[in-house]
A protein has these predicted regions:
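Phosphate/anion-contacting hairpin/loop surfaces
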Residues: 1-201
Length: 201
C-alpha cells in the first residue's frame, strides 16, 4: 500500500484507488455465455430474503453455446473453462481448485477454494446496496477488487477466489484472482478469451 494523504482524499472526496494502491494481482474475466439456469427461481442456494447467490452450484447438463475460447462466464455468474485451462492448472500444480466436468462437452465448471480477502468499503471504487440481515451480505456489490490490509500474500503465483460475491442477486459470483506471475504464465500458455483486470493492495 502506498502512503495516503488523508487530507487530499477528504478534499477531493473521490479517492482514486490507482493513485493510492499498487497493482498486486489480476482478476480473470471472460466472454459471456447463455445463463446456466432459466429464471431466478431455479438458481440453487439463493438467500430466501434478498435472493443473493450464496454458493455456486452448477448444472452439469448445461451446454455452452460458445466453445472457441478457454474462459467464460455464464450470464448468471458461473465460470466455465476449457480442457486447455484445466491442463494449465494441472501442469502448474495449482492446488485447491474445483473442476466439475460438464456432461455434454469437454468444458468444466471452475472455482478455486482458496480465499482472497477483500476490502469492499473503498467508495466509490465499490458500490453496494441492500444489506440483508438474514445472509449477512449485500444483494448488490459492484466495482473493482481491493485486497484487505490484514491479508498477506506469500507468493506472486496463485489462483484464488474472493471472499465476497460480486454482481447482483442471483447473478453474483466470486471473482477469480491470480498472481502477476500467474498472469504471465497464462499468456505464455496461450489461453484465449481471458481479460485481466487490476487488483489493488
Amino acid at each position: 500500500m502506498k502512503d495516503i494523504d488523508c487530507y487530499k482524499i477528504k478534499k477531493i472526496n473521490i479517492p482514486g484507488v490507482a493513485e493510492f494502491y499498487d497493482v498486486i494481482a489480476k482478476t480473470l474475466n471472460g466472454r459471456e455465455l447463455k445463463p446456466m439456469y432459466i429464471g431466478a427461481c431455479n438458481v440453487p442456494c439463493l438467500c430466501p430474503y434478498c435472493y443473493s447467490k450464496l454458493k455456486s452450484v452448477p448444472d452439469l447438463d448445461y451446454v455452452p453455446n460458445k466453445r472457441r475460447k478457454d474462459f467464460y462466464y455464464t450470464s448468471d455468474g458461473f465460470c466455465i473453462v476449457s480442457q486447455k485451462f484445466k491442463d494449465f492448472c494441472d501442469e502448474g500444480r495449482y492446488g485447491n481448485l474445483d473442476f466439475q466436468k460438464l456432461n455434454t462437452s469437454d468444458f468444466y465448471f471452475f472455482e478455486p477454494h482458496e480465499i482472497f480477502k477483500t476490502n469492499i468499503h473503498w467508495i466509490p471504487f465499490n458500490e453496494f446496496k441492500i444489506w440483508c440481515n438474514a445472509c449477512k451480505n449485500y444483494a448488490e456489490l459492484t466495482g473493482g477488487v481491493l485486497k484487505d490490509e490484514s491479508f498477506k500474500l506469500e507468493t506472486n503465483d496463485f489462483i484464488m477466489r474472493t471472499d465476497n460475491f460480486y454482481g447482483k442477486y442471483e447473478n453474483k459470483h466470486p471473482m477469480i484472482v491470480v498472481g502477476l506471475e500467474t498472469e504471465r504464465k497464462m499468456k505464455d500458455f496461450g489461453l484465449k478469451g481471458i481479460d485481466f483486470d487490476n487488483v489493488y493492495g
